[in-house]
Curated annotation (Swiss-Prot):
Coiled coil: none annotated. Aids in the defense against invading fungal pathogens by degrading their cell wall chitosan. Changing E62 to D/Q: Drastic reduction of activity. GO terms for biological process: carbohydrate metabolic process. It catalyses: Endohydrolysis of beta-(1->4)-linkages between D-glucosamine residues in a partly acetylated chitosan. It comes from Streptomyces sp. (strain N174). InterPro entries: Glyco_hydro_46, Glyco_hydro_46_N, Lysozyme-like_dom_sf. This is Chitosanase. Its main location: secreted. Residues 1-40 form the signal peptide. The keyword Signal applies.
Length: 278
């Protein structure tokens, strides 16, 4: 999963509130009173409310919308050399995670509409090829997106490959919700791994400049170093040369001292303004 801003999406106007019908974790509602919200003020990104915020922040950069649940059906080739990009965090046919997603979906629901594409997905893994996929695949993807089992499979793979490892590493580094989100957004775009422009390499570069809180360092100083390293990694690739998701989103929260990522949140991605009030 290495994604860029999806230019096919038309930027939405300012979203005044962001209270969806359901949260990233099913069955848990938003805090309904100031008192209950205050109790969660220092919650980690895996808190349902904070996780919903994280999903909306990523969607603002990936889809020019806070409605991340509308993205299960999304699929297109964005021309970055990674084949098709699809779903809620941009699973790619060329990087292996789309293959893993469809395999997981098939484990949950054998004989599903996408199962027949598993051989083709295995063949195109590591390339930009559409061989054996094409329009029939993209149409079937959109159909599958209506299936709650496929939606759950996307949620599962997002958490297994990206969200859970990012949050776990950030907590081990002594970072609060903003730092946990910075790690998550980085791993979504750059992928896991330890090469210089993958998440592990970006973290390693940052740790050469500043100590993590777990090492006795200052949290803000370290996060600035991490965002510097993230931006440098983005600039090595034309598909990621717009760094607004760092400059006018995460850095804005950091400069405001909002290390717990508490709403209200105001930011811009690709020049488009967004607001999460609660």
């Amino acid at each position: 999963m290495h994604s860029q801003h999806r230019t096919a999406r038309i930027a939405l106007a300012v979203v005044l509130t962001a209270i969806p019908a359901s949260l990233a974790t099913a069955g848990v509602g938003y805090a309904s009173t100031q008192a209950s919200t205050a109790v969660k003020a220092g919650a980690g990104l895996d808190d349902p409310h904070k996780k919903e915020i994280a999903m909306e922040l990523v969607s603002s950069a990936e889809n020019s919308s806070l409605d991340w649940k509308a993205q299960y059906k999304y699929i297109e080739d964005i021309g970055d050399g990674r084949g098709y990009t699809g779903g809620i965090i941009g699973f790619c046919s060329g990087t292996g995670d789309m293959l893993e997603l469809v395999q997981h979906y098939t484990d949950l629901e054998p004989g599903n509409i996408l199962a027949k594409y598993l051989p083709a997905l295995k063949k195109v893994n590591g390339s930009a090829s559409h061989s054996g996929l094409g329009t029939p695949f993209t149409k079937d993807w959109a159909t599958a997106a209506k299936d709650t089992v496929f939606q759950q499979a996307q949620n599962d793979e997002r958490d297994r490959v990206y969200f859970d490892p990012a949050v776990s590493q950030a907590k081990a580094d002594g970072l609060r919700a903003l730092g946990q989100f910075a790690y998550y957004d980085a791993i979504v775009m750059h992928g896991p791994g330890n090469d210089p422009t993958s998440f592990g390499g970006i973290r390693k570069t940052a740790m050469k400049k500043a100590r993590t809180p777990a090492q006795g360092g200052d949290e803000t100083t370290y996060l600035n170093a991490f965002l510097d390293a993230r931006k440098a990694a983005m600039l090595t690739e034309a598909a990621h040369d717009d760094t607004s998701r760092v400059d006018t989103e995460q850095r804005v929260f950091l400069k405001a001292g909002n290390l717990d990522l508490n709403p209200p949140l105001k930011w811009k991605t690709y020049g488009d303004p967004y607001v999460i009030n609660s």
